Amino acid sequence: MKNTKYCREDGYSGEMRKMDDKKLKVCLVGLSGGHLTHLYMLKPFWKNKERFWVTFDKEDARSLLQGEKLYPLYFPSNRSIKALIINTWRALKILPKEKPDLIISTGAAGAVSFFWLGKLFGAKTIYIEVFDRIDAPTIAGKLCYPVTDRFIVEWDEMKEVYPKSINLGSIF
């Protein structure tokens, strides 16, 4: 398992630096726990941008994102048609109101509605497949892949799973 690090010392990748050149409104979608931690580690990119977060209304998320604009996802969301419908409805209310230029997600089910609807509203999308997936796709990754502008993986083996992906190495 080869994990090549392509990120620069300042935490920016070349792809994200290109997007940094203009003032962006960013939507960060990730479930609480590891997905949210993964997104938070991109702080060098999002810290000076107008942004809002979409995650579970749980203690770890509230603590980490204290002072941030936060929209709650319906919980539990994995493999639940009910949750997909509720979170799609929430995305339909949030996206036209916030009008993000860019949606970034580290996955899980909550990302699906925001990516598909985000594209309809003109947002660019970046999906980061989670670090612990080395050679097999996640369900959310498979569902978001067709509408993702930049699909980022953290292992060379994942390039076989997602041929159009970019391996930027570990975010950790």
Walk through the language-model features, giving the residues of each.
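Active-site-proximal region of nucleotide-activated glycan assembly enzymes
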Residues: 123-172
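Conserved nucleotide-sugar phosphate-binding/catalytic loop shared by glycosyltransferases and other
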Residues: 30, 48-87, 157, 168-171
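An aromatic- and histidine-rich active-site surface loop
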Residues: 102-121
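Structural motif
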Residues: 25, 101-102
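An amphipathic, basic-hydrophobic alpha-helix
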Residues: 79-101, 120
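N-terminal subdomain of nucleotide-sugar transferases
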Residues: 2-6, 11-56, 65
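Helix N-cap/beta->alpha junction signal
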Residues: 32, 107, 154-156
